[in-house]
């Protein structure tokens, strides 16, 4: 909840300084810009909290709760970081800290860090309805779930690390293409990994 409150606080502080004549002419546009991402963070929190309460698949699996909430928290921190960066870019603060020059790279680096942070937790997950490779087999076979998500965790951390480095050393357009290619490759590897373990 602290992350959510901070997001709304940052939006409220930046609200009067968000510029643009088009924004002034569009009723509610300034509020949408200032509070859309904090609202998204709140929705993420409420949605996954509801899924946890109504998840019958993970019944009796209390050890997974800390990992579940850690993944949600890291996702929320990423959204908050994006929001804070956006507010910096849209207000006069950008002239002080120079977000025009490094802002886009920071977005890619933040994405890489978030993917690594979440991927590091995937091997600790257990069958649930919220996230992961959710098929009839993985949801009913904890051993299969663990095998698939162990590989998925390694892949996700590696993907995040490459994205992080790409954000630092590669141009923005090239980084976007590389990220897309790596995501497709990771999904393909996960598909064949699942098929391999499921048919074993």
Which positions does each model-derived feature cover?
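Conserved phosphate-binding loops in nucleotide/dinucleotide-binding enzymes
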Residues: 19-40, 135-154
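Cytosolic, membrane-interface loops and tails of multi-pass inner-membrane proteins
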Residues: 55-63, 126-144, 148
């Amino acid at each position: 909840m602290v992350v959510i409150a901070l997001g709304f606080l940052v939006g409220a502080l930046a609200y009067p300084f968000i510029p643009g004549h088009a924004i002034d002419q569009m009723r509610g546009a300034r509020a949408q810009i200032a509070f859309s991402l904090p609202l998204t963070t709140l929705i993420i929190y409420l949605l996954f909290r509801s899924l946890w309460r109504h998840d019958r698949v993970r019944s009796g699996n209390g050890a997974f709760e800390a990992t579940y909430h850690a993944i949600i928290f890291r996702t929320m921190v990423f959204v908050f970081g994006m929001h804070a960066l956006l507010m910096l870019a849209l207000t006069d603060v950008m002239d002080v800290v120079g977000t025009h020059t490094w802002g886009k790279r920071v977005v890619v680096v933040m994405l890489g860090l978030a993917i690594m942070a979440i991927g590091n937790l995937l091997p600790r997950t257990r069958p649930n309805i919220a996230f992961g490779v959710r098929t009839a087999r993985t949801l009913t076979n904890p051993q299969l779930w663990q095998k698939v998500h162990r590989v998925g965790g390694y892949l996700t951390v590696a993907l995040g690390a490459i994205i992080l480095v790409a954000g630092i050393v590669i141009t923005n357009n090239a980084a976007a293409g590389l990220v897309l290619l790596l995501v497709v490759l990771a999904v393909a590897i996960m598909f064949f990994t699942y098929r391999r373990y499921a048919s074993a």
